[in-house]
Amino acid sequence: MAEAEGVPTTPGPASGSTFRGRRDVSGSWERDQQVEAAQRALVEVLGPYEPLLSRVQAALVWERPARSALWCLGLNAAFWFFALTSLRLVFLLAFGLMIIVCIDQWKNKIWPEIKVPRPDALDNESWGFVHPRLLSVPELCHHVAEVWVSGTIFIRNVLLFKKQNPGKFCLLSCGILTFLAVLGRYVPGLLLSYLMLVTVMMWPLAVYHRLWDRAYVRLKPALQRLDFSVRGYMMSKQRERQLRRRALHPERAMDNHSDSEEELAAFCPQLDDSTVARELAITDSEHSDAEVSCTDNGTFNLSRGQTPLTEGSEDLDGHSDPEESFARDLPDFPSINMDPAGLDDEDDTSIGMPSLMYRSPPGAEEPQAPPASRDEAALPELLLGALPVGSNLTSNLASLVSQGMIQLALSGASQPGPSGAPAQRATRGFLRSPSSDLDTDAEGDDFELLDQSELSQLDPASSRSH
């Protein structure tokens, strides 16, 4: 609506950032176009001189040390000749340009007309000079074009800066020119020219062989030691200042020292030497005072140097034989062998729960009572007999009651009728001792206690068999 009425609108921050991004993209695209144009122009000019440029690069990077040394000596001789000669500069410049023009005419105009062409010249026209580590003409022209475009952009920015800020440009240019004037006043121009020549000659060599990286790797330990030495020097200076302040103000230093000692004493409690020696003298088989007090309070204690996970470490160390250690730990595993009294019950759902200890004394006769009433009457005695001595009644009562009820229910469900012998076998099967769970195949001489009625039933069968 505002645009339709002709009211100018100010762009927001989002639109401003978008505009700057578009301007940066357009500027980079224009720069790439300029670089490509300059590269094409340089390739057209330097294309015929590719072998010569390759030889110059090989000489600058010292691929062939003999030729490179000759080139270096020739350049040094030419430089010092022009520097120390009594001839005029204009004469030398004109004479040098005349020699260059003659060589160019001979190589490009006269020699191609009088030389005999080779038979494979047409085949070699499509091939170019390739070196694995030297720059080809297109690559060299690309780098030169980037430098040229960067220089032109810099000059353009300087001219724009001069137009927008003439005062700042005047101060900046005067400062730079003053520095160059002082440098030229104290350093001869001949030496500066020679340094520039040596830099141009040695720079490709340093880049080609990565001398800067190698020098940094060699100097890195020394620089690190220098850094540490500087830090140590600063720390020593700080300590000297502190000592000087303490010497000038001893009362303040004593107050600070006492305060620091009190603070450290608060964090470091004092220990009695006799108590420490007595605690250190306690062996693994003895008990300390703290352990005895814990025992008096009714809680369990652990000997020094033992934990619930490492309480049996001495026993494990004593049994190095794997078979012996396996046989020793075998009673801890539940047995898979069923009691002979419980073989007739196929649905044994005890699921490996610890069975209750119940053994009738030898010679005692069991009263002929119904199985259910006899089991119910024996339940309290079983629970009290199976209760471990010295254990906590409250913690074990729930588990014992639940186990007894499950066993009674299973024994009641497994008996089919009023017959007493199968019910007694089932009850004894479910109320067997833990020692019966440890029977193996080798221990096949198991026995069970039978009533007098059972013995009378078995006697006629044995007499008939005999």
UniProtKB/Swiss-Prot annotation:
It is found in: Endoplasmic reticulum membrane. Residues 316-331 have a biased composition (Basic and acidic residues). Residues 102-163, 208-381 are lumenal. A motif (LIR motif) lies at residues 445-450. It is a multi-pass membrane protein. Induction: Induced by amino acid starvation but not by endoplasmic reticulum stress. It comes from the Eukaryota. Keywords: Acetylation, Autophagy, Endoplasmic reticulum, Membrane, Phosphoprotein, Transmembrane, Transmembrane helix. Endoplasmic reticulum (ER)-anchored autophagy regulator which exists in an inactive state under basal conditions but is activated following cellular stress. When activated, induces ER fragmentation and mediates ER delivery into lysosomes through sequestration into autophagosomes via interaction with ATG8 family proteins. Promotes ER membrane curvature and ER tubulation required for subsequent ER fragmentation and engulfment into autophagosomes. Required for collagen quality control in a LIR motif-dependent manner. Mediates NRF1-enhanced neurite outgrowth. It holds the Pfam family RHD_RETREG1-3. The keyword Iron does not apply. It comes from Homo sapiens. Residues 1-28, 284-374, 412-466 are annotated as: Disordered. The chain crosses the membrane at residues 81-101, 164-184, 187-207, 382-402. This is Reticulophagy regulator 3. GO terms for cellular component: endoplasmic reticulum membrane; endoplasmic reticulum tubular network; protein-containing complex. GO terms for molecular function: endoplasmic reticulum-autophagosome adaptor activity.
